[in-house]
A protein has these predicted regions:
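Concave beta-strand-loop units of leucine-rich repeat
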Residues: 5-18, 31-42, 53-78
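Boundary/entry segment of secreted carbohydrate-active catalytic domains
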Residues: 83-147
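Aromatic-lined substrate-binding rim segments of carbohydrate-active enzymes
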Residues: 129-131, 142-212, 238-277
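Noncatalytic carbohydrate-binding groove/subsite architecture in carbohydrate-active enzymes
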Residues: 245-398, 409
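Aromatic/acidic polysaccharide-binding cleft in carbohydrate-active enzymes
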Residues: 383-454, 463-469
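Carbohydrate-binding surface patches
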Residues: 467-514
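C-terminal beta-strand-rich structural cap/linker in extracellular carbohydrate-active enzymes
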Residues: 531-555
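C-terminal outer-membrane/trafficking sorting elements
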Residues: 561-571, 575-642
């Protein structure tokens, strides 16, 4: 339990191991005096918006947690800090907002939500990929169709489930679920990979629609391990002989851009798909200008060969929010990772470190806030494994916040790494919304709830404006005004106070609304509150979103939404080990029958999520039967055990 109440004095003396004041983030009352002397490295002034130092005590005074008459001694017994001169920690400073704000189409936010997945290979199954993408409400997949240094990607026309990604795999996902794709060169490669990629993209378009492709992407992390490139016989990037020779990497990206733009289908005379930059350009071993989308003609630090060259239309990042140099928990963890300006959080792999001043060798690119914030930008990898610090619950909260923070700060697309855990490599076994047996994690349910509440299928023609204020807003409270195509406003307000505590805010409106619905995606898809004749709402904001809905609401009543929405999903299918059943209503009983009608499994549930262990059942076909609490059959489905 977090520490919330101290009735008397707070005395911390001669504790050399004490670092910061992280354990006091949730304190609501401090009844006595404060003496913190001769301790460890407690910062006097914070260097960023996360450090909990003596500024926390100043906040206690400002917020009334500490009596203004209390005696405060901080620092060293021989050299006290002037408490009166301290400022509150930046993340505690109240920054109220008030005004009339223009909405962004809700559909545009939903379109930004993407995944990294192998679709129908590496142990993944296209049928289940479709099912779980639908459940999550994710709209696009980052895919590689170029090949590698040693091989080309040859997409067959068709393939069996789990037997490799084919043109038919892309067609199934697009035709059935509207899923779109970015198409990348992949990790490593040679110049021959470029025409291979272009050909595969055109085959996908022929089988689906021009709308199925979002963009063409450059090489994946050419600084990494063996993901070097060979261009015209010369090795560049990676960690071998090309480590400090990035000219082949730049030439590869330059040729990709030129060939895509010159192609009659993909290029300027065709659908003119944007080209995304390669990733981790901030690790360039030499200054070849990859810190620019288009290299200025007058940047004499870049070789003449690359001056004036256009490498990409869009900046592409792998700005992981949980990184060895930016570890969880920190307040504003995902918000700071999405920072688009020169205000660089310590240790965070942000836009500036790849397109401002590169993190490895300090090559200079875009140096002003205006230049950086104007860059079109996407993220094609980010995420976090589960650990002692990042629990499954916390991962779910972070993933929701990540998509919101990225979009609110100008990222058009964000792909999480990963849709499901890898089955063929170590170290990546808990990134996924699903584990390798397709069991959903909390992150899957939370994202499902968020996208279901915001569900929309097209952009509103002319987004409207909403007048509102947020009082009591601190630096960890964020807002995003969305609007559905039917005119309904969805005001998303979320917090990133991951070190504990909450902020009581008041959302005020310039008029009284007959009915306002307030959703909490951690609780489900039905409104947590339905308020009538309201012009203000009080909320405690901590580490998850609330969604305030103004306008048209779902036609069903709240009670109907809770009890009459019989959407039952069972996946994966085919199943390897565990079959997970998720329902929007309470399940009473689950049974499995073989094809002879024999009951081979039955279980009482009384919950919305249930897992059937099919590991010991023979391979073959089974009939799944799901009953509600009253014994009514609400689902029958054929299930294949592989």
């Amino acid at each position: 339990m977090p520490l919330t109440y101290i009735g008397g004095d707070l005395v911390l003396t001669n504790n050399r191991s004490l670092q910061r004041l992280n354990g006091f983030g949730s304190l609501k009352h401090l009844g006595g005096n404060v003496s913190i002397l001769d301790n460890g490295a407690i910062p006097e002034e914070p260097s960023d918006d996360n450090v909990i130092g003596f500024c926390k005590i100043k906040y206690y005074e400002m917020a009334g947690i500490l009596d203004e008459e209390a005696t405060v001694q901080l620092g060293r017994s021989t050299s006290l800090i002037d408490f009166n001169s301290l400022s509150p920690c930046p993340y505690e400073v109240v920054e109220d907002i008030s005004g009339t704000f223009k909405a962004v189409p809700a559909n545009r936010f939903l379109n930004s939500i993407g995944m990294n997945t192998s679709i129908n290979s590496r142990g993944e199954n296209v049928n289940t990929t479709e099912e779980i993408m639908r459940y999550l409400g994710a709209r696009w997949i980052r895919t590689s169709v170029g090949g590698s240094v040693s091989s080309l990607t040859n997409l067959p026309e068709t393939s069996l489930p789990g037997a490799g990604t084919s043109i038919a795999s892309y067609k199934q996902l697009y035709d059935n679920a509207g899923i779109r794709f970015s198409a990348g060169l992949g990790a490593g490669g040679q110049e021959r990979n470029i025409p291979n990629l272009i050909n595969n993209v055109k085959r996908i378009i022929d089988a689906t629609s021009p709308d199925a492709i979002i963009a063409i992407e450059g090489n994946n992390e050419p600084n990494n391990r063996n993901w070097y490139v060979i261009f015209e016989g010369e090795v560049g990037g990676g960690n071998k002989e090309g480590k400090n020779n990035w000219k082949p990497v730049a030439r590869m990206q330059k040729k990709l851009y030129e060939d895509v733009k010159a192609d009659p289908v993909l290029g300027k005379d065709g659908y003119n798909y944007p080209v995304w930059s390669l990733t981790d350009g901030g690790a360039s071993g030499e200054n070849v200008g990859l810190q620019y989308l288009k290299v200025p003609e007058d940047d004499m630090a870049v070789p003449e060969e690359f001056r004036g060259v256009t490498f990409a239309d869009v900046a592409n990042l792998h700005n992981y929010f949980n990184h060895p140099s930016f570890k969880f928990p920190q307040n504003n963890q995902t918000w700071r990772a999405a920072e688009p300006s020169t205000n660089v959080p310590p240790g965070c792999d942000v836009l500036y470190r790849h397109f401002g001043v590169t993190w490895l060798n300090k090559y200079k690119g875009y140096l002003t806030d205006e230049e950086l914030e104007a860059l079109p930008r996407v993220t094609t990898e980010t995420g976090s494994t589960i650990s002692d610090a990042v629990t499954e619950e916390m991962q779910g909260l972070l993933y929701m916040s990540l998509y919101l923070a990225q979009f609110a700060q100008g990222f058009d697309y964000t792909a999480m790494y990963l849709l499901t855990d890898r089955r063929d490599e170590s170290g990546n076994q808990s990134f996924g919304f699903y584990d390798k047996f397709y069991n959903p994690r909390q992150s899957a349910h939370y994202l499902h709830n968020l996208t279901t509440i915001l569900k929309d299928d097209k952009d509103i023609d002319e987004p409207g404006e909403l007048t509102y204020s947020i009082t009591g807003r601190t630096i960890t409270v964020h807002d995003l005004l969305l609007q559905k195509n039917n005119g309904t406003f969805e005001l998303v307000i979320w917090g990133e106070k991951y070190e504990g505590g909450s902020d009581r805010i008041t959302v005020g409106f310039d008029q009284t609304y007959d009915e306002v619905w307030v959703y909490n995606p951690t609780k489900g898809t039905a409104p947590e509150m339905v308020l009538n004749n309201v012009n203000s709402i009080e909320l405690d904001i901590s580490n998850h979103p609330y969604i305030i809905e103004i306008g048209e609401h779902p036609e069903s009543s709240v009670e109907d939404m809770k009890n009459d929405d019989f959407q039952i999903r069972a996946f994966p299918n085919p199943v390897i080990r565990n079959l997970t059943i998720y329902s929007d209503t309470e399940i009473g009983k689950v049974s499995l029958f073989d094809m002879m009608g024999n009951c081979v499994y039955t279980g009482r549930v009384y919950d919305k999520v249930y897992t059937v262990d099919m590991d010991n059942l023979p391979a073959g076909a089974y009939i799944l039967s799901v009953l509600d609490e009253s014994g009514n059959c609400i689902k029958k489905q054929k299930v294949i055990k592989s």
